[in-house]
Amino acid sequence: MLTVSGLVKRFGGFTAVNNVSFQVEQGEILGLIGPNGSGKSTIFNMLSGTLVPTAGSIEFEGVEIAGVAPHRIIVGGIGRTFQIPRPFHRLTIFENVALAGFYGQGSHSRARAEDAAERALGMVGLPADRHASVDGLGAAGLKKLELAKALATGPNLLLADESLGGLDDTAMDQAADMLRKIRDELGITIIWVEHIMGVLMRVVDRVMVLDHGEKISEGLPSAVASDPRVIEVYLGTDADSSQLAAAEARRGAGV
């Protein structure tokens, strides 16, 4: 479905992403992890058209999309969420989602957008009440709204950016289960950027790890968690995989 080859992004003399290549298969959930500043968001911004790569290729469903404008990428079947939700507070919950649906698939049909909004809100567990205010949503509700907006665009590939940020343990588990439900029931392929590795590892099919803009590991969650390079990046050279798991458990618990 998605083939990324030799992706590079430079900002002046700083290289944020350096020669990263990977593939994502139809129906897969790929976890993308790494320390702050490792290049995760930069890759998402290039996949979604917000940034133009310095070099490299991004091929989605057989079409080269590197440098394509964001609105065309959305119409082409890639939707994304953002780490920090920024809804339109003058619009209702329903209107926020319908607006995304209106522009997402390029049909500019109000009826189609409203139908997409109803389905997306139902999927994430938010009411389709057309008068409910965005201001009544807490952290978990805003994350659901962000996800519903992305789903309303009708994506074949969903880029989920830190869907667990700011949530408690129960809400984190629910959000992770929601991503798996979206894949299982809607057939949407997902790339998931997340810092809460303990939760991510139980949901994804594969994991890719970045450090300083370079891919340092890729594979099954169990293999990546025991990779010495990954352990060193997260905890230092004297750590082992059990310490990595314990550290991530504490992070997920907010300790």
Where are these regions (language model features)?
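Glycine-rich phosphate-binding loops of nucleotide-dependent enzymes
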Residues: 1-255
